[in-house]
Amino acid sequence: MSKKRLYEIAKELGKESKEVVARAKELGLDVKSHSSSVEEAVAAKIAASFKPAAAPKVEAKPAAPKVSAEKKAEKSEPAKPAVAKEEAKPAEPVAPKTEKVAAKPQSRNFKAEREARAKEQAERRKQNKGNNRDQQQNGNRQKNDGRNGGKQGQSNRDNRRFNDQAKKQQGQQKRRNERRQQEDKRSNQVAPRIDFKARAAALKAEQNAEYARSSEERFKQYQAAKEALAQANKRKEPEEIFEEAAKLAEQAQQVQAVVEVVPEKKEPAVDTRRKKQARPDKNRDDYDHEEDGPRKQQKNRSSQNQVRNQKNSNWNNNKKNKKGNNKNNRNQTPKPVTERKFHELPTEFEYTDGMTVAEIAKRIKREPAEIVKKLFMMGVMATQNQSLDGETIELLMVDYGIEAKQKVEVDNADIERFFVEDGYLNEDELVERPPVVTIMGHVDHGKTTLLDTLRNSRVATGEAGGITQHIGAYQIVENGKKITFLDTPGHAAFTSMRARGASVTDITILVVAADDGVMPQTIEAINHSKAANVPIIVAINKIDKPGANPERVIGELAEHGVMSTAWGGDSEFVEISAKFNQNIEELLETVLLVAEIQELKADPTVRAIGTVIEARLDKGKGAVATLLVQQGTLNVQDPIVVGNTFGRVRAMTNDLGRRVKVAGPSTPVSITGLNEAPMAGDHFAVYEDEKSARAAGEERAKRALMKQRQATQRVSLENLFDTLKAGELKSVNVIIKADVQGSVEALSASLQKIDVEGVKVTIVHSAVGAINESDVTLAEASNAFIVGFNVRPTPQARQQAEADDVEIRLHSIIYKVIEEMEEAMKGMLDPEFEEKVIGEAVIRETFKVSKVGTIGGFMVINGKVARDSKVRVIRDGVVIYDGELASLKHYKDDVKEVTNGREGGLMIDCYNDIKMDDVIEAYVMEEIKR
C-alpha cells in the first residue's frame, strides 16, 4: 500500500500541518512532524476526523483565493468598483466556505492570485492607452535589441529606458491624484482651527477666580482681627494696646503660613497645542503628504534597504529624543548632583614599609592630592605613586590623628624562622633522639681510621694523601642506641667544613695523636667547638706507638682551655688506639653518657627541618644532597626547600646505600629531586605543598642574586687608588670542578688566599660534577684553565680541550693544587731586573772623525767594559748621558770586552760630546728570581 505524508493530507483538507499532526497524535498515531508518512487507511481515518471541513475539498481551493484576490483588486482599484463586483459574482455560492479557508493564510491559492494580478495589470494597460507594454512585449524587444546590436541596439535601449521612466512618473502622478481626491472627501472631518487668544484669556480668567476664592478666607480673618483690635483699643491702656497688636500680628503670620503650606487644588491644565488628527485609513505609501501640506519626494524609492515609513522609524525617534531637542526635553527635570560622601578616619592604621601615597589614600579614604599636600607641608616632596618609608608614614598618621602600627609579615621564604620559632615544636610530642657526634682533629691524626673502626669498614684506606676530602655521615648502634657520626677533614683548607660540622653537632670527639700532640688544626677545632658551645670528648689516639706521651697531650690541651675531669675540668679524656681497636667501647659509652646528660629531644610529628651536610652533582641522578634531619620526619615525595633551590624528595638512601621512605631526627640521608645542587651548610625545610615550596625557593634565589649584585664594589674617592692599582694586577682565571660542594668551597677559598704580589686569582666558575664541554667553552672564552678535583673530563670535553688548546689540571690532593697554582702565578709576573756595575774606564784622548763621530780612547781602571753593556758618562760626579755602546775596539780590532788595565777605543750611540777625564761606567741589568 502507498503512503501519504501529513502535510499532503493537510493540503487536501485545507488545514494547517500542525493541526493534522496534533489530530494524528490524538488518534494515537506515532508521528513526529508534518513530514511523517502514514498508510492510506490511516490517512482516510485522519481525514474523517475533520468532518465539518472535509466535504467540498476540491471546490474550495480555487474559490477561496479568487475572493481574496478580487478583494485586493477592490482596494487597489477604487475607481472601478463595478468590475470587481461583477467578477466576484461567480464565487457567491461558495462564499461561506471560502471565508473559512481565507482565515488561514498558510493555505493560499497562489494560482488564483496570479490570475487576479494579471487581470489587474490588463486593466491598467487599458487605462494607460497602450503606453505600458506587458512583460512579453518587453522581452521580445530585448531579444530584437540583442539581434540587431551596434548603435541601433544602443539607441533602442536608450528609448526603452526613457519610456520606462515616463511610465513610472505617470503611475506616480496617478497615485498622487487619487490620494488628493480621497483627502478632499475627508476634508469635512478635519477639526476646526483653535483660537489661541480666546483660549488664553479664558485660562487667565479662571486662574484669577481661583486666586480670589483662596484669598477670601484670609481677608475675612484679617478684617475680623482688625475690628476686634479697634474695639479693644477703646478700653485698654496704650501699653496693653501694643502688646495685643503684637500678639495679633503673630497670629496673623501663623495663619498665613498655614494657608501657604496647604496646597491649592488646581484643575488640570488644558493642552492648547494643536493636535494631529488620527488617520487610521491612511496608507503606508502616503509618503509625500502630511497634515501640514506636501513634502519633498523621497529619492530611491525602489531601494529595499531604505526605511519607507520614516515617521515610525527608530532613526527618527532617536533624532527627536536627542539631548539638544528642546521641544522634547523642556519638561525634563535635571539630574540631581551627587554629593561626595564623607568617610570618617580610622582609629588605627596598619602599614608596611614601601607603601605608596595612593595605597595610603585608599586605606584611609582620602584623596591622594590631600595626602601629597600634607607631605609637602611636612617637607616631603612626593607623588601618589611614590613609596614612603615607615617613619614618614607614622608622621603622616600622627598629623591625621591615627595610631600607626607596622604590620608584621610572615616571610614564607625565610627557612631560618623554623629553627628559632618557639611554637614550631610541640612540647608534648618531644622524644629522645640520637646524638650527633663530629670527629675533628689535625691531618693524619686518625679521624677517618677511628670512624672506619666504628663502622667496621675500610673506607679510610681509600682517602687520597691520607686526608679526608668531604664530610661523611654515618650511623652506628651501641647498646641499642643510635649514634650519628660526622667526619670532617683536618686540612687547613677545610676550615668552613669544620665550622659547619661543629654547628650541627651535639658532641665533639677531638682526636689528638699521642706522638704529635696539639697541632694548628687541633686548636682550630677547639675554637669551633667552644664557639658552638658543644662539649668536647678528647680521644688520645696512637697510644700504641713507641713515642706516645698522653700526659704531654693533656698538658698541652689544658693550655688551650680543654681541662680533663681528673684535673677539675669538664672534658672527658679517653686513650684509644683506632688501628688496634683499643678502648673503642669505652669511648662510645662516654659519648652516650654525655648525650644522656644533655637530654637531647626532638619532635618527630612536625615537618622536617635540618642542614645540608654535603651536595654533589651526579651524572645519572642529578643534584644529590646529604641532609641531616634535626627536627621532624622527612618522607619521600615531600616538597622541600634547600638553601636557594627547591624540589620534591624523589628518593632517599641511608648511610649504607639502602633506600628508605622515612628519616627521623638525627638521621643522615642522601636525597635526589632538587633542581640544582645546594651549598653545603644550607638549611632545608619541608613545606605544605609544592606550590609554596616553589614560590619560596624562587624568592630565595632572587634575593641571593640581588645580594650578589649589591656586593659588587663601586668606585669611590676612598677606593679609587686601590681600584687603579688592582687594574694593573695580572689575573689568573680558574674554573674549578670537584666531586662535592665542600671541596669546591675549600679550593676556592684556598686559591684566593694565595699571596703573590702583582697577581690575583679569579674564580670564573665553580661547580660540582665532571668536566664537560660547556666548561671547556667557558675556559676558552675567558682565557682560563680548568682544575678538576676528584673528577675527570668527559671524552667529548677532552677532545674539545685539545682542539681549543685549553689546559686541564687534574688533582686529588688539595695542597698539590695550591703549590701548582703558586708556581703558575709567579710565572705570570713580569721579570724584575737589578742593575749591576761591571767596570769603570777613564777617557785619555778624543778623536773626531768626519762622518763617524767622536772616538774616545780609554783605559779600564776597574772591572771590565763589555760590548753589550750599557754605559754612563760621568763628568765631575754628575751623570751627563746614559746609553749604549756603538762600538768597542782594542787598537784596530773589534772586541767583546776590555778588561782591567787595558786600553781601547769606544763610540757611544747617539752621543759625541766626549771629553778628556770623563768617567765611563759600564753596567748590566740582571733578572731577579722571585
Swiss-Prot record:
Record key words, sorted: Cytoplasm, GTP-binding, Initiation factor, Nucleotide-binding, Protein biosynthesis
Spans annotated as G5:
577-579
Q: Per the database record, which ranges form the tr-type G domain?
A: 432-599
Annotated protein name in UniProt: Translation initiation factor IF-2
Upper lineage ranks?
Answer: Bacteria, Bacillati, Bacillota, Bacilli, Lactobacillales
Give yes or no: UniProt keyword Transport. Answer: no
Region G3, annotated ranges: 487-490
From what organism does this protein derive?
Streptococcus pneumoniae (strain P1031)
Sequence segments annotated as region (G2) = 466-470
Q: Where does the record place Low complexity bias?
A: 50-67, 129-141, 309-318
Mind telling me which Pfam families this protein's record contains?
Answer: EF-G_D2, GTP_EFTU, IF-2, IF2_N
Region (Disordered) location: 50-217, 260-346
Question: Which Gene Ontology CC terms are recorded?
Answer: cytosol
**Stretches the record annotates as G4:** 541-544
User: PANTHER family given for it?
Assistant: TR-TYPE G DOMAIN-CONTAINING PROTEIN, TRANSLATION INITIATION FACTOR IF-2-RELATED
Look up keyword Ribonucleoprotein and say if it applies: no
Main role? One of the essential components for the initiation of protein synthesis. Protects formylmethionyl-tRNA from spontaneous hydrolysis and promotes its binding to the 30S ribosomal subunits. Also involved in the hydrolysis of GTP during the formation of the 70S ribosomal complex.
Q: Where is this region: G1?
A: 441-448
Name the protein family.
Belongs to the TRAFAC class translation factor GTPase superfamily. Classic translation factor GTPase family. IF-2 subfamily.
